Amino acid sequence: MIRRAVVAGQFYPDDAELVEMLKRFFTDLGEEGNSRRITAGVAPHAGYIFSGYTASRTYKAIYEDGLPEVFVILGPNHTGLGSPIAVYPKGEWETPLGRIKVDEKLARRITELSEIADLDDLAHKYEHSIEVQLPFIQYLAELSGKDVKIVPITLGIQDEEVSYALGKAIYEASQELGRDIVVIASTDFMHYGEFYGYVPFRARADELPNLVKEWDMRVIRRILDFDVEGMFEEINAMNHTMCGPGGVGVGIVYSKLAGAIEAELLHYTTSFEVSRSTDAIVGYASIVMRKA
């Protein structure tokens, strides 16, 4: 089973420009490490011109720490298709950079242990939040010469219960099968503006990005504290429009079980830096979680 790229040429280039763009993002890339301290990362999933550099910071850190065998990638289900919690079962995902294999055994075991997920490919058919992560992984895997695999999971339900159930299942499955993994939570942060129907504050155009950042930082601080409950409390209190909190919650739960003790915000920006539009402003953050 091959899942074909559906947003190549839209969210990211579908030709040789993709490699050139990735090279530009990674001009400061260091040597591949072997520490393997990073347990999870947060990366945005907007068009590369808006959030590609921010996403690259997460993958740069992972590469310099050492690539894992498997990336378990969680993204929000924007389409509403398929199972509410859908683990892609088997086969390969294709992008302009080639194909990357799904770890079928790990996918199945996570699904079984979670008791809330289904093996389902329909939810992934048109979803972009996981696909846009793959060129970063493929580019670095090619540099490394490693045969990296993935387990894609879309979330149509995102709450504390899902975070704990899936985070625990991913940890137990990876331990049981002896897999070295990193969890990637694919999410954008605040979606502000009339375009999104979310205008909790108004200000001059030059002030808006800072206000968006302030509100995002209320959530990000909770993430950096590994505080799942606090993160959802902040989101609910502000009616915050972050689109992938469930995946971040899973990353926190998994990381704590895996022994992570620190989290770092590597980069933050908003779409305003590129678009200069206040009709729609989206926040983007790069975060990693690490063991001692």
From Swiss-Prot:
Pfam families: Memo. InterPro entries: MEMO1_fam (IPR002737). Belongs to the MEMO1 family. This is MEMO1 family protein PF1638. It comes from Pyrococcus furiosus (strain ATCC 43587 / DSM 3638 / JCM 8422 / Vc1).
